Amino acid sequence: MEGLRIAGDTTSTVCVDGEGRAVSFIHSLAFTFGARLTVPGTGVLLNNRLGRGAYLIGGHPNEVKPRRKPLHTLNAWVYDSDTLGLLHVGSCPGGDGQVQWNMQVLSHLVDHGATPQEAVAMPRLTVSPGSDSNVLGHRQELRCEPGLDSATLSRLREWGHNVVEVPDQVGGPGGSAMAISLDHANGTLAAGADPRMEGIALAL
């Protein structure tokens, strides 16, 4: 198993069938081994998602209370059109970066006409720190992957962002995106898997 990444606790799958039905699924244990409890007789490990970002501090925006849905990072999406139906489906594990990265991938697909593989491989930006208690209060950064042009980085700095250039995409802070697009003109599907982590795009 040399070379395989063993860090991480979130998995995601996106799929589209021949009739255009789509699923975007994401599951996470939250911390390593989740709640460290299994459902008896099943081997299913329970997550500790509530314990990762919800607080017992009165008045905290993510305070645990009855009838509340605490903020969490899981984010899967399907993008469709009122006239055409399904256009794109995707997901991107990676903690607090998920919403940020999914929006960037979706923008590449919708606003810039990228293919799914192009969209998931493009450099990404990440606002940091996230919401985990161990990073709250850390200095604000805008982490930028390699490949963003110097003019863009300069403009971000002019706008007041504390730009931090990360050295590498692979295994870096950009998550592990995947996407599938449906071309209604010719009835074909195209898929992309992020080069940052292990993943694969398959036609079955």
Cite the ranges covered by each PLM segment.
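Proteins synthesized as precursors that undergo proteolytic processing into mature forms
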Residues: 3-167, 174
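In a subset of proteins, long, contiguous C-terminal domains/tails are tracked
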Residues: 151-204
